[in-house]
Amino acid sequence: MNNIKTGVVLARLHPIHNGHLELIEQACDENDQVFIFIGSADKFNQRNPIPINLRKQLAEEALEELAKRYLTGVIPADVHIVPLDDLTDESDNSHDWGFYLFTKILKEADTPYFTIYYSDGFEIITTWFPSFVMRNNVSLKLIARGATCSGISATKVRKMILDGDDEELKKWVPQCVYDCRETLKKHIQLANMIK
């Protein structure tokens, strides 16, 4: 077993918001390396309206903003952003999905031991992996969605963008997302035309 502590954040980032950043910051504070897997990388629909290249770019820019919070100006972990296609569909919580995710993490992180940082229900993650994997390889750090930034969600952020609620939006997203709101609005509007 290696001594490098590895954290994994799995999120779709449609778009990245301050709740995601709280989760990422905690993972960075507690690990040597952090892998941010951007899920549903291969999807474009109402639930997944922002192309993966833009989500990845905004995540990178948000991390640059996050680094400024540290005295050194550097995030204390080695951070990697990795697009992750869905295995079947995003509601798949089977062991097949768990093994798919596990092998992707193993390939990227080069370790079978990691902590997943997540803000949805505990029961969801426990359905992904057989008990022996949970017991031997995977630790969980669950942060209640309501506990991160007063329960902000990407769905709420997208609504603020569509409604042009710039004042409220500015409170909940990194500056890079706020600055990109018109481009994001066009992607969201286009995706909303798809039935």
Predicted regions and their residues:
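Nucleotidyltransferase catalytic core that binds NTPs
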Residues: M1-K195
